[in-house]
Amino acid sequence: MATANFGKIQIGIYVEIKRSDGRIHQAMVTSLNEDNESVTVEWIENGDTKGKEIDLESIFSLNPDLVPDEDIEPSPELPPPSSSSKVNKIVKNRRTVAAVKNDPPPRDNRVVGSARARPSQLPEQSSSAQQNGSVSDISPVQAAKKEFGPPSRRKSNCVKEVEKLQEKREKRRLQQQELREKRAQDVDATNPNYEIMCMIRDFRGSLDYRPLTTADPIDEHRICVCVRKRPLNKKETQMKDLDVITIPSKDVVMVHEPKQKVDLTRYLENQTFRFDYAFDDSAPNEMVYRFTARPLVETIFERGMATCFAYGQTGSGKTHTMGGDFSGKNQDCSKGIYALAARDVFLMLKKPNYKKLELQVYATFFEIYSGKVFDLLNRKTKLRVLEDGKQQVQVVGLQEREVKCVEDVLKLIDIGNSCRTSGQTSANAHSSRSHAVFQIILRRKGKLHGKFSLIDLAGNERGADTSSADRQTRLEGAEINKSLLALKECIRALGRNKPHTPFRASKLTQVLRDSFIGENSRTCMIATISPGMASCENTLNTLRYANRVKELTVNPAAAGDVHPIMHHPPSQIDDLETQWGVGSSPQRDDLKLLCEQNEEEVSPQLFTFHEAVSQMVEMEEQVVEDHRAVFQESIRWIEDEKALLEMTEEVDYDVDSYATQLEAILEQKIDILTELRDKVKSFRAALQEEEQASKQINPKRPRAL
């Protein structure tokens, strides 16, 4: 009898069901549950099999063709019930209700005749029916069903599970709300980025901190790359900027970059970088020096070449690291790497094994600005960089000052820092626009014994200013961009022991050529980063650059990478090659090689721009040199012409001789000045070519190096 209640529903057939979100679709019947008069159905959604338990009433309401047929004959006194009433009675599965309705109910028990009686009234209905003797017309099964009446709709297991999940969800939401309220009390709610602040704090709470300490061992590296984080400065604190840099261990740096989804939901993208050493904002200069530059001091006493670079955005702490602590605008040079390295050099000189060498210590300090070299110890005199027949790079006119103690070094540093070129950029109001190179040179009987070069590089955000409307700004950005690319490739070549180093691609690497060549050369790079969220992009650029420098040194399998040669359309520069004779110069070859090795960072348009700038700088130097030679020649012409004029004052001077000599002087003047004029015209054409190339720059990655 119970199976008949399911009507035409069978296991394996498909029925229409209604989901909780209102969707109606088909599902397959997998079981019939007689105990609670329900069926279990399953369907496939998004590749997953899902199931649900549904009562018969819901099934029959959506699938009326599955309703069971009436198997009890209606009373002959009553007309056949209509199809609608039949369906309504069967839906409730109470087929005895029709017989009960046939007898008029007692007046004191009107509820019995109602097919929609509430469950609380059903016991009274049952007792009243028994008192009136109506039970004799009903079968025992029907009587039992009538005694309990139409039961309330029983909850399926799925519904119970959903209710449990909903209850847990509400409880969890309440806890989260309480937690948010508690956090709001702990943080400054007026900070527009307090949500990001809470995310960063929660993330840091899950980290295991093991920072670098002075007790950690110093590893031997031919190329050492480390990162130093500075604390938030006064301006950033006033602006309520957030610290988005975390250094959980001695060699790991994490950047919490704030991002925003399409629905304006904010979230963090945590990026991790690994280096040789990572210094947090509590590390003093002495600790940074101990792990970076100090191991290089002994190299120069072993007839080696050492270099230490400070790289990063302006204001990130490069000059603080290299020059010393600041107290307002005054700098304590005794706490910088310059002075610390000089101190150790003089201490090493006193050791017995080095004292017998009778070494002399010299120092130089110069800057490289827009591809030109200036002596900071000689009133910023412009210097020339030439390569001799032995392929040794010579900085003509650079003064070397002998130093006897650390105090002498500090005086030279003060003199040089006061002359260094600086200016305003898009990132900072006071940006170092030049590379400052301080060198400690050891000589033995006048011959070079070792050299330690300490370089405070220009702010790397300046390298993004290659499309500026101002030519001087463009040239600054182009030279910084090119020199940083060349520096990276030279360090890579040093780490891989490559046969060729593209040092001629920039003035910086050309001057430091001897530091990248030779078995006894060592390099250290200190990447300084700002912790503020406002500097996040520049910080990521600095970390990516430093990571690429070290990344390839530990991956020798990539040494055989071959990059296709870039082809560029002919330009006006190519037309000038024949006249100027610099088309196949070593500088241009190294520049092309440099751009080919960095195709992911240098677009063809940017390469054309760098090529135009290099060509223009070479032509500028040649025009200035020729102009200087013409000027010197003009002085001689004046003397010759003065002698001719004095000759004409004589009574019987030789007119033929006068005319011949004057004509010779004029022809010489015309030839030299015509040649200079042609070069000036070509130089102006190169200036226009550079301006056109700057307007077509479309770098593949719109960021500074």
Swiss-Prot record:
<dbReference type="GO" id="GO:0030154">
    <property type="term" value="P:cell differentiation"/>
</dbReference>
<feature type="compositionally biased region" description="Basic and acidic residues">
    <location>
        <begin position="158"/>
        <end position="186"/>
    </location>
</feature>
<keyword id="KW-0505">Motor protein</keyword>
<feature type="region of interest" description="Globular">
    <location>
        <begin position="1"/>
        <end position="216"/>
    </location>
</feature>
<keyword id="KW-0206">Cytoskeleton</keyword>
<dbReference type="GO" id="GO:0008017">
    <property type="term" value="F:microtubule binding"/>
</dbReference>
<dbReference type="GO" id="GO:0005874">
    <property type="term" value="C:microtubule"/>
</dbReference>
<feature type="binding site">
    <location>
        <begin position="312"/>
        <end position="319"/>
    </location>
    <ligand>
        <name>ATP</name>
    </ligand>
</feature>
<dbReference type="GO" id="GO:0000922">
    <property type="term" value="C:spindle pole"/>
</dbReference>
<dbReference type="GO" id="GO:0097228">
    <property type="term" value="C:sperm principal piece"/>
</dbReference>
<comment type="subunit">
    <text>Interacts with AURKA and PLK1. Interacts with PSRC1. Interacts with MCRS1; the interaction enhances recruitment of KIF2A to the minus ends of spindle microtubules which promotes chromosome alignment.</text>
</comment>
<keyword id="KW-0458">Lysosome</keyword>
<dbReference type="GO" id="GO:0007052">
    <property type="term" value="P:mitotic spindle organization"/>
</dbReference>
<dbReference type="InterPro" id="IPR036961">
    <property type="entry name" value="Kinesin_motor_dom_sf"/>
</dbReference>
<feature type="modified residue" description="Phosphoserine">
    <location>
        <position position="139"/>
    </location>
</feature>
<keyword id="KW-0493">Microtubule</keyword>
<dbReference type="InterPro" id="IPR027417">
    <property type="entry name" value="P-loop_NTPase"/>
</dbReference>
<dbReference type="GO" id="GO:0090307">
    <property type="term" value="P:mitotic spindle assembly"/>
</dbReference>
<comment type="function">
    <text>Plus end-directed microtubule-dependent motor required for normal brain development. May regulate microtubule dynamics during axonal growth. Required for normal progression through mitosis. Required for normal congress of chromosomes at the metaphase plate. Required for normal spindle dynamics during mitosis. Promotes spindle turnover. Implicated in formation of bipolar mitotic spindles. Has microtubule depolymerization activity.</text>
</comment>
<keyword id="KW-0221">Differentiation</keyword>
<feature type="modified residue" description="Phosphothreonine">
    <location>
        <position position="96"/>
    </location>
</feature>
<feature type="modified residue" description="Phosphoserine">
    <location>
        <position position="134"/>
    </location>
</feature>
<dbReference type="Pfam" id="PF00225">
    <property type="entry name" value="Kinesin"/>
</dbReference>
<keyword id="KW-0963">Cytoplasm</keyword>
<dbReference type="InterPro" id="IPR001752">
    <property type="entry name" value="Kinesin_motor_dom"/>
</dbReference>
<keyword id="KW-0217">Developmental protein</keyword>
<keyword id="KW-0067">ATP-binding</keyword>
<dbReference type="GO" id="GO:0098935">
    <property type="term" value="P:dendritic transport"/>
</dbReference>
<dbReference type="GO" id="GO:0003777">
    <property type="term" value="F:microtubule motor activity"/>
</dbReference>
<keyword id="KW-0007">Acetylation</keyword>
<dbReference type="GO" id="GO:0005764">
    <property type="term" value="C:lysosome"/>
</dbReference>
<dbReference type="GO" id="GO:0005524">
    <property type="term" value="F:ATP binding"/>
</dbReference>
<protein>
    <recommendedName>
        <fullName>Kinesin-like protein KIF2A</fullName>
    </recommendedName>
</protein>
<dbReference type="GO" id="GO:0030425">
    <property type="term" value="C:dendrite"/>
</dbReference>
<dbReference type="GO" id="GO:0051301">
    <property type="term" value="P:cell division"/>
</dbReference>
<keyword id="KW-0175">Coiled coil</keyword>
<dbReference type="InterPro" id="IPR027640">
    <property type="entry name" value="Kinesin-like_fam"/>
</dbReference>
<keyword id="KW-0498">Mitosis</keyword>
<dbReference type="InterPro" id="IPR019821">
    <property type="entry name" value="Kinesin_motor_CS"/>
</dbReference>
<keyword id="KW-0547">Nucleotide-binding</keyword>
<feature type="modified residue" description="Phosphoserine">
    <location>
        <position position="75"/>
    </location>
</feature>
<dbReference type="Pfam" id="PF22923">
    <property type="entry name" value="KIF2A-like_1st"/>
</dbReference>
